[in-house]
């Protein structure tokens, strides 16, 4: 059985880690390279950087962050945000990232998933989906940092992304993001059952128990969190030890 992964997420804006609640109200959480090294030392399985800078300057800063992070950590890391072409992917991977995360750009031009997978391999392509509930057992895909409704069904889009060559799905429940009341279990379970690639659950982690719930009931392959790690509300080690006591296979 494959070990379940615990993944801290770092939202980076103009070279600083920030964390908001339901995609708004950002507050500063620290230096991305320092935080990445801390999580690598604490035995996180992977890291995800999401560049939420709006400006070209901010994007250039991100390449610098990736290069410094790559030199300082020993675990794989994914970078997403503002990646719109194979050239963008090349720039990020050359700077030291292991995987690319595509969100809005993939919804606007799904062929980008295939292009990236063809050049770099499916294992490098993570498709991030921001999902909001629109009724019983129905979720809609949102883009542009959770601002724009697309009318697209989340489960169908996850299946399409897999067919185009995505190697992984990063699934954020917008309804639960930042609330710390638990992951979107039904959403995660439905998507996990609908695709044959790993699903990383995101949005809602507040307690160690929430990780257990989403990795078992939600059938996720990995669970991601931000603020509870950034602000030392719990640690990677504490989450992993708890999961081990509950019989969940994790890397030590």
Swiss-Prot record:
Protein origin, superkingdom: Bacteria
Pfam family, one: His_biosynth
Reactions this protein catalyses: 5-[(5-phospho-1-deoxy-D-ribulos-1-ylimino)methylamino]-1-(5-phospho-beta-D-ribosyl)imidazole-4-carboxamide + L-glutamine = D-erythro-1-(imidazol-4-yl)glycerol 3-phosphate + 5-amino-1-(5-phospho-beta-D-ribosyl)imidazole-4-carboxamide + L-glutamate + H(+)
Amino-acid biosynthesis among keywords: yes
Molecular function GO terms recorded: imidazoleglycerol-phosphate synthase activity; lyase activity
The entry's keywords: Amino-acid biosynthesis, Cytoplasm, Histidine biosynthesis, Lyase
Top-level enzyme category: lyase
Active site (record annotation): 11, 130
UniProt keyword annotation of Cytoplasm present: yes
Metabolic or biological pathway: Amino-acid biosynthesis; L-histidine biosynthesis; L-histidine from 5-phospho-alpha-D-ribose 1-diphosphate: step 5/9
InterPro entries: Aldolase_TIM, His_biosynth, HisF, IGPS_HisA/HisF, RibuloseP-bd_barrel
Compartment(s): Cytoplasm
GO cellular component: cytoplasm
A GO biological-process term: L-histidine biosynthetic process
Family, as annotated: Belongs to the HisA/HisF family.
Quaternary structure (record): Heterodimer of HisH and HisF.
Function according to Swiss-Prot or TrEMBL: IGPS catalyzes the conversion of PRFAR and glutamine to IGP, AICAR and glutamate. The HisF subunit catalyzes the cyclization activity that produces IGP and AICAR from PRFAR using the ammonia provided by the HisH subunit.
Protein's name according to its UniProt entry: Imidazole glycerol phosphate synthase subunit HisF
Organism: Brevibacillus brevis (strain 47 / JCM 6285 / NBRC 100599)
Lineage: Bacteria, Bacillati, Bacillota, Bacilli, Bacillales
Gene, per the UniProt record: hisF
């Amino acid at each position: 059985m494959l070990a379940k992964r615990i993944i801290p997420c770092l939202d980076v804006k103009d070279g600083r880690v920030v964390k908001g609640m339901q995609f708004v109200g950002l507050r500063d959480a620290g230096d991305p390279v320092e935080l990445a090294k801390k999580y690598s030392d604490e035995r996180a399985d992977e890291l995800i950087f999401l560049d939420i800078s709006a400006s070209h300057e901010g994007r250039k800063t991100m390449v610098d962050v990736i290069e410094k992070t790559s030199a300082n950590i020993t675990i794989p890391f994914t970078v997403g945000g503002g990646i719109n072409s194979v050239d963008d992917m090349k720039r990020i991977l050359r700077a030291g990232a292991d995987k690319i995360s595509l969100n809005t750009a993939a919804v606007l031009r799904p062929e980008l998933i295939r292009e990236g997978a063809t050049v770099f391999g499916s294992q490098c392509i993570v498709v991030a989906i921001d999902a909001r509930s629109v009724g019983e057992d129905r979720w809609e895909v949102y883009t542009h940092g959770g601002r724009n409704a697309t009318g697209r069904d989340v489960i169908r889009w996850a299946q399409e992304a897999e067919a185009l060559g995505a190697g992984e799905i990063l699934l954020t429940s917008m309804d639960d993001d930042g609330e710390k009341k638990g992951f979107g279990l039904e959403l995660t379970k439905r998507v996990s059952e609908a695709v044959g690639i790993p699903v990383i659950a995101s949005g809602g982690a507040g307690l160690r128990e929430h990780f257990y719930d989403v990795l078992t009931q939600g059938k996720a392959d990995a669970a991601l969190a931000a603020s509870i790690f950034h602000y030392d509300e719990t640690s990677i080690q504490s989450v992993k030890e708890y999961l081990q006591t509950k019989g969940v296979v994790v890397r030590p």
